[in-house]
Amino acid sequence: MPIFNTIKAESLDLFLMMGDNVYGNSTSENLNELREAYDKQKQNFDKLDFDFPIEAIWDDNDYGLGDGGKEYYLKEKSKELFLDFWDVSNDDPRTKRSGLYHEIIKDYEGKSIQILFLDTRTFRDNLKPSDDKGAIGKERYVPFPDTSLTMLGR
């Protein structure tokens, strides 16, 4: 992907991949589309041999289901593919709990910077579609008053 050539040319301390890192929506048990998307991206990354760390979180397309939430029955298999692709170590907390949310703390010019990666897929309840999509004040999805529903799993 040409964008990665531009990114590689920069002098970066860290690069954040904030989701939709691959496009592999899958409904088949074997997640072939998602596997193929990760394989293709791995080839891109291997060619570039990045010389800076990359941290990542997923969104719907690397989760495996367009606009998916907690209802996606293949989310744990998708998570395994994500962890494997990003080479997340076995002692990382993400390997032992639901979801991929995490934080990193980086020191930069004498200051600590905390970066939070929110998993807005694993725990998210179904969205309530608008009754009049496109109308002013009727965005694609509207708030739902049930406070027991979650996005972050708490």
Regions inferred by a protein language model and the residue ranges of each:
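Metal-dependent phosphoester/phosphodiester hydrolase catalytic core
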Residues: 1-154
